[in-house]
């Protein structure tokens, strides 16, 4: 059993009843608490207390968001476009693409065209993320792009992974993903030229992709067909994944995606009362190059407090359970600098944790 210390508690900026759960981003030694409401996206610097508010171009149910490492710009990955805005809400650039709603064939010009349409209210979605240095935006969209011409519009739409210039939205690289997504998310890498992408296809599968941008072209490799990316180690050399059934944690080499070691939840983690199935959460974190923090909060639900565990990467062995000063809820998420965070059950605060001195 490992004791941990509470590094900080951060109050969320928006009412949880009308906003998404908060996320704590970490880039280059800086943390940024981000929370999306219907009318705005808020980015809070926990160290300085400075808050930046980005007016939202559409309600929060229509797509996903990303914030630049310096907190100065935000990207909204919507149903019809990837839009970059500054803190005034002014559009810096926009990349319009095929509509994510069902079989809709339209490359829309504005959100108002479908704002009141029920089918568009339940559209699938892509995602976007800034590179580590903030100079690139990686985006998963549905094709065709607005500038692809009539020939592309007549073809069966393909989903695309784009590398965009964060300054002006220029498409620098693109690759077809061959997927039919219901949603996706990105996993950043310390190297701005690399990025991970997990794509959920509902019952069709869950491919995980790894992209590399060499300044001229985007190359994409499939990590696994039933795989979810969880985190990248601080050195950038190791990748943590799980399978869609959440049976095991897999340590992989970023260079080629090769599986190095794994750890099954069953047999490693103490069982549940009544013999229920134990499985890993869809979120976990590298505390450092040699230590993973992972949880079984999903399978623990209904049986007691969420349980979190330390895993030694050298052999992918369970080092032990974590003892917190008070019960925690939900999974663990990476907070950088050897720390991780949890969100309180009422979603009103974020707790940042680190191993106690000597642990």
Language model feature labels by segment:
Residues 84-98, 125-140, 254-263, 280-291:
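Conserved long hydrophobic alpha-helices within structured protein cores
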Residues 13-28, 55-71, 99-131, 176-190, ...:
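Repeated scaffold domains used in trafficking and secretory/extracellular systems
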Residues 277-282, 287-329, 333-334:
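C-terminal appended segment following the main domain
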Residues 1-18, 36-59, 82-121, 151-178, ...:
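Surface-exposed loop/turn elements that mediate protein-protein interactions on large endomembrane-trafficking
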Residues 215, 233-243, 257, 261:
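A contiguous, surface-oriented mixed alpha/beta subdomain in the mid-to-C-terminal portion of proteins
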Residues 75, 115, 120-138, 145-146, ...:
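Fungal eukaryote-biased detector of long internal structured cores
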Residues 22-43, 67, 71-84, 135-154, ...:
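Short beta-strand elements that form the blades of beta-propeller/WD-repeat-like
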């Amino acid at each position: 059993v490992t004791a941990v210390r509470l590094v900080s508690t951060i109050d969320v900026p928006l009412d949880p009843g009308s906003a998404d759960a908060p996320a704590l981003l970490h880039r280059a030694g800086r943390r940024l608490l981000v929370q999306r409401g219907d009318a705005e996206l808020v980015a809070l610097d926990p160290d300085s207390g400075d808050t930046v508010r980005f007016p939202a171009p559409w309600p929060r149910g229509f797509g996903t968001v990303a914030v630049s490492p310096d907190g100065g710009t935000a990207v909204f990955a919507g149903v019809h476009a990837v839009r970059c805005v500054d803190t005034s809400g002014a559009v810096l650039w926009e990349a319009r693409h095929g509509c994510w709603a069902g079989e809709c064939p339209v490359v829309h010009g504005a959100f108002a065209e479908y704002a009141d349409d029920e089918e568009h209210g339940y559209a699938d979605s892509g995602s976007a993320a800034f590179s580590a240095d903030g100079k690139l935006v990686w985006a998963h969209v549905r094709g065709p792009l607005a500038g692809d011409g009539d020939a592309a519009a007549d073809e069966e739409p393909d989903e695309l992974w784009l590398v965009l210039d964060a300054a002006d939205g220029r498409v620098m690289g693109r690759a077809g993903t061959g997927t039919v997504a219901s949603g996706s998310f990105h996993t950043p890498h310390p190297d701005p030229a690399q990025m991970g992408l997990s794509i959920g296809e509902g019952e069709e599968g869950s491919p995980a992709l790894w992209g590399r941008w060499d300044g001229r072209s985007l190359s994409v490799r499939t990590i696994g067909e039933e795989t979810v990316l969880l985190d990248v180690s601080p050195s950038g050399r190791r990748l943590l994944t799980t399978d869609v059934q959440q049976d095991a944690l897999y340590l992989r080499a970023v260079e080629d995606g090769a599986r190095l070691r794994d750890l099954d939840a069953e047999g490693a983690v103490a069982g549940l009362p009544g013999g229920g199935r134990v499985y890993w959460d869809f979120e976990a974190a590298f505390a450092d190059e040699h230590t993973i923090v992972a949880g079984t909060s999903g399978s623990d639900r209904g049986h007691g407090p969420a349980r979190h565990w330390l895993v030694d990467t050298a052999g992918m062995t369970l080092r032990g359970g974590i003892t917190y000063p008070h019960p925690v809820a939900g999974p663990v998420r990476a907070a950088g600098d050897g720390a991780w965070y949890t969100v309180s059950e009422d979603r009103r605060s974020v707790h940042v944790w680190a191993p106690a001195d000597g642990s």
